[in-house]
C-alpha cells in the first residue's frame, strides 16, 4: 500500500506504484513515475519527466529531475530515467537531459550515490557504481559499471570512465579513464590497475596479470599510442584460450581505441 505523509505534495497526475513511501514535505511533480517499493525521505523534490524503477531509496533533501544547468535549455520535455535498487543520499542533485544530446539522463541499477553528489544533464551512469560524497560530474559524462568515484572528485563534460575504474578523492578528471585503471590527482593521471577491486569482483589472477601487462604496454614500455593499441590487440589474440581474459583485454583495447576525448596520461 502506498504511504504518503500528510504534509507531502504529490501531483494528482504523478504515477506511484504500490508500496511507495513519500516522506514529510516532499514534492512529487505531475510527470513523475515511481516504481514499487521506492522510498522518498522528507523534503525531497522529484520533478520533470522523471521515471524511477523499483526498490530505490531517496534520502532527505535530494533534488531529482530538475532542469539542466545549460544556458541553451529552453524548456524541452527532456527526461531522467533511474533504474532499480539505487540509494541516493542527502542533498544529491540529478538533472534531466538536453535536446543537444539524446535528451535523457540515465542512472542504472544498484548504484550507491552519497551525499552532495551532482550528476548533470545527459550523463549515463551504469550499474553497481559508488559515488562518494561531493563527487561531481558535468554534462554528457559516461560512468560505466562498477566504477568508484572518490569524494570531492570532479569530472569534465563528455568524459568517459571505464568499467571497474576508480577515481581518487579530490581528483580533477578531464580525459577518459580506461577500464580497470586507478586515476588520481588534481590533474588525474594513471596509477595502475585496480587490483584490489578486481579481486573483490572475482577476477582470476591470470586476468588481473594480463590487464597489468596491458597497462604496462600502454603506459610504461615506451610505445606510442598507436603502437600500444597494436601490442594490446596481439595480447587479445594470444589469450584466445582463456575467454574471460581475452574479453577483458578486448574491452581495454576497444575503449582506448574508441576514445575521442583522449585517455589520461
Curated annotation (Swiss-Prot):
Main location as per UniProt: cytoplasm
An annotated GO BP: lipid A biosynthetic process
GO cellular component, one term: membrane
Disulfide bridge partners, by residue number: none
Signal sequence, start to end: none
Lineage: Bacteria, Pseudomonadati, Pseudomonadota, Betaproteobacteria, Burkholderiales
Pathway note: Glycolipid biosynthesis; lipid IV(A) biosynthesis; lipid IV(A) from (3R)-3-hydroxytetradecanoyl-[acyl-carrier-protein] and UDP-N-acetyl-alpha-D-glucosamine: step 1/6
UniProt keyword annotation of Chaperone present: no
GO molecular function: acyl-[acyl-carrier-protein]-UDP-N-acetylglucosamine O-acyltransferase activity
Record text on subunit structure and interactions: Homotrimer.
Enzyme Commission number(s) of this protein: 2.3.1.129
Keyword field: Acyltransferase, Cytoplasm, Lipid A biosynthesis, Lipid biosynthesis, Lipid metabolism, Repeat, Transferase
Function (record text): Involved in the biosynthesis of lipid A, a phosphorylated glycolipid that anchors the lipopolysaccharide to the outer membrane of the cell.
Catalytic reaction annotation: a (3R)-hydroxyacyl-[ACP] + UDP-N-acetyl-alpha-D-glucosamine = a UDP-3-O-[(3R)-3-hydroxyacyl]-N-acetyl-alpha-D-glucosamine + holo-[ACP]
Descriptive protein name: Acyl-[acyl-carrier-protein]--UDP-N-acetylglucosamine O-acyltransferase
Name of encoding gene: lpxA
Compartments reported by the entry: Cytoplasm
Homology family: Belongs to the transferase hexapeptide repeat family. LpxA subfamily.
Domain of life: Bacteria
